[in-house]
Amino acid sequence: MIGGTHSTVNEASNEGMIKLAVQEEINKKVGEVKDIENRKKNVIIYRVPEKNSKSVLERREHDADFVKDLLDGVFNIDIQEGDIEKMYRLGQWTDGNARPMLVGFKQYEHKEQIMSSLWKFRENSIPKFQGVSISHDRHPAERLEIKNMVEDAKKKHLEEEGDDTENYWFRVVGHGSKRKVIKFKKRN
């Protein structure tokens, strides 16, 4: 009888551990989905010159002016007060290093208008914006998935065609399960 009770306690303990592990995994997935949803209205702008000032307020003001000029000058988007929910630099400030800038919009439409008009950067002749690039703000798991997809495509390219990958660009297009890698030849 004592052995049977001990067995029942172990089964209950194992069942409790399994339930706890499942609940932790569900919470992790829910948190990831919420994080992805929160990032949907954000863009990351790279190589924006950073004002060389010790004053945080001066640097923030400079960044806000640059973003407003960029959106107006390149994308013809008139940003009003309150259209940008958040805007800050990513990483630690160091002298002479331009950190990426995260910009979060109040409305998804602003971000979508920017991302669908990225071709305007190539036609842009304003020197102030040369070298600047914009990308989606992605969850770390998404970034890793995209990186792995590109690496796999490069390996497959080398195996099938034997041609060096240096002459090609590999780009991931699509969303979610509909993502695929396309390759195109670099221009000389």
What kind of feature is each model-predicted range?
Residues 2-188:
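C-terminal folded interaction/catalytic domains of modular proteins
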